[in-house]
Amino acid sequence: LGVGADALSPFQVTWGRFFFALPVLLVAALVMRPRFSSPQWGWHTVRVTCGVSGVTAMFYAATLIPLADTTAISFLNPMFAMVLAIFILGEKIGPIRWSMAALALIGAMLLIRPGTAGFQPAALIALFAALVFGMEVVVLKLLSRTESPFQIILIANIVGAVVASAVAPFVWQAPTPMQWVLLAATAVLMVTAQAFFTNALRVGEASFVLPFSYATLLFAAFYDLALFNVVPVPLSLLGGLIIISSGIVLALRDGRAARKA
């Protein structure tokens, strides 16, 4: 969505993501005519706050560091969700989960590289995004106990559009015709991916579905190379591989535990 002086603010991109996704979801609601239950507005507010903050931070981080690095760091969100679930959901975490969380943290340190000449301060923004996305996952678990996936997605986009619309005027820059197209395309792609992912989790086991989400890193690295001519450094590749490996092990282990239960 532009570089240099022509680049749109991450807040404006976030606005586009929610604003243009909303009509798609409203049309889907008219076609599907789903049943709605009484929303838990307090938790929805927390979820939307995390979602808007996380999306904005991710967009901003991607303007400062390679897209592949931003994506890899974002995959820490299941680890953050695991830790937060202890305090919010009362879940108990075993030694294997803690080991995978520690391994993922090592991978993140390889990407961020604190205290070295290769230190990327902007990577901390992506780390913040992973943290709030982790919180969002925990809130989603709470909401899914009483509300349907479509209702959760629809409410999040309605509230997100309102919040983003309140912030956007302060950073507004008139988009070019192509940027309008890209804003709309970003929204449609993100809500479509969200719908596919939600339905995949509905019809398949999480342990089977979740590892496929890590293919995002491969696409991010490809887009870095194809669009921005950015080649990932070996240390970043290693850090990303460690994070992905720990996430896959955790997903597969949880799947086996669920089947035994």
Which residue stretches match the model-derived regions?
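C-terminal transmembrane-helix exit sites in multi-pass transporters
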Residues: 33, 78-99, 171, 218-237
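Hydrophobic/small/kink-forming positions within alpha-helical transmembrane segments
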Residues: 26, 48-56, 78-83, 108, ...
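Loop-to-transmembrane-helix transition segments
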Residues: 29-59, 121-129, 174-192
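Transmembrane alpha-helices of multi-pass small-molecule transport proteins
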Residues: 7-53, 132-135, 155-170, 245
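Transmembrane alpha-helical segments that form core, pore/gating elements
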Residues: 1-10, 25, 116-175, 182-183, ...
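Hydrophobic transmembrane alpha-helices of multi-pass small-molecule transport proteins
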Residues: 96-113, 133, 235-254
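Hydrophobic/aromatic residues within transmembrane alpha-helices
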Residues: 4, 13, 17, 61, ...
